[in-house]
Amino acid sequence: MNNHFNCIGIVGHPRHPTALTTHEMLWRWLLDCGYDVIIEQQIAEELKLTDARTGTLAEIGQQADLAVVVGGDGNMLGAARVLARYDISVIGINRGNLGFLTDLDPDNAQQQLADVLEGHYIREQRFLLEAQVCQKNCQKRISTAINEVVLHPGKVAHMIEFEVYIDEKFAFSQRSDGLIISTPTGSTAYSLSAGGPILTPSLDAITLVPMFPHTLSARPLVINSSSTIRLRFSNMRSDLEISCDSQIALPIQEGEDVFIRRCDYPLNLIHPKDYSYFNTLSSKLGWSKKLF
């Protein structure tokens, strides 16, 4: 055993129960290798691992050096939003569909992870967004997002009107179905589907992508990640929401503004040594192949 990662957490809730076999295989293999292993409590209960050391996501973030997320991108997003608060590295084994954030192939995960545990890996920091919904002198509702923060109508799709301020300076007003505010990580997710640009992960930039704007002149906007975005609403005829990674919703009420900024802490991602962002674009999203 080496000292790159001594305590390893196993997390993630795959859509298909059969994928839980990966968790058990991983748990037994890591124990046999001499690592201290913490497995997420709910997973241990489902697998009936009565002798396993268990913990919540927060406890794993506090105690482990590396978290292995087993599942798809949704599992990675949900776990990583919590784990990013702590000094822990994160890597994923893909048991979902696309697996853009989960690098390890389930059929070869043990060997790939063994190489990582021996110190053969790439470390990368990805920044998150923090969204605040607040009114003057009122308590804030706060959440974070790894991919994107989306302004949209509540339950029924319709046009909404809002103003966008960047660093407290008016930028533009819009009448549209909403607005996608994306990190470089999220630029290949919902933002891409709406016509937004692809940003390489190392860029300190945020994209603002309109959703079906009722104008001929609206275009995606790329700004520095150090900027603070403020959304204002003058005529709220119906409920609006802020959605974080399509997993957490924050309702917006009359008289409230939305503030979106770069989060104070990053996500520490671990990739295999042969990881290439552009190879991932090609294999997962059909990016152009090499000609020669």
Swiss-Prot record:
Give the keywords, sorted. Answer: ATP-binding, Cytoplasm, Kinase, NAD, NADP, Nucleotide-binding, Transferase
Sorted alphabetically, which InterPro entries does this protein's record hold?
A: ATP-NAD_kinase_N, ATP-NAD_kinase_PpnK-typ_C, NAD/diacylglycerol_kinase_sf, NADK
Q: Where in the cell is it found?
A: Cytoplasm
Gene Ontology BP annotations: NAD metabolic process; NADP biosynthetic process
Q: What is its EC number?
A: 2.7.1.23
Q: Which reaction does it catalyse?
A: NAD(+) + ATP = ADP + NADP(+) + H(+)
Q: Which Pfam families match?
A: NAD_kinase, NAD_kinase_C
- Summarize where NAD(+) binds, as residue positions: 73-74, 147-148, 158, 175, 177, 188-193, 247
Gene3D superfamilies, per the entry: Probable inorganic polyphosphate/atp-NAD kinase, domain 1, Probable inorganic polyphosphate/atp-NAD kinase, domain 2
Q: What class of enzyme is it?
A: transferase
The main place the protein resides is cytoplasm
Give a yes or no for keyword NADP in this entry. Answer: yes
Give GO MF terms, alphabetically. Answer: ATP binding; metal ion binding; NAD binding; NAD+ kinase activity
Active site annotated at which positions? 73 (proton acceptor)
List the record's Gene Ontology CC terms alphabetically: cytoplasm
Q: Which cofactor does it need?
A: a divalent metal cation
Q: What does this protein do?
A: Involved in the regulation of the intracellular balance of NAD and NADP, and is a key enzyme in the biosynthesis of NADP. Catalyzes specifically the phosphorylation on 2'-hydroxyl of the adenosine moiety of NAD to yield NADP.
Q: Which HAMAP family match?
A: NAD_kinase
- Family that this chain belongs to: Belongs to the NAD kinase family.
Official protein name in the record: NAD kinase
Q: Lineage in the entry?
A: Bacteria, Pseudomonadati, Pseudomonadota, Gammaproteobacteria, Enterobacterales
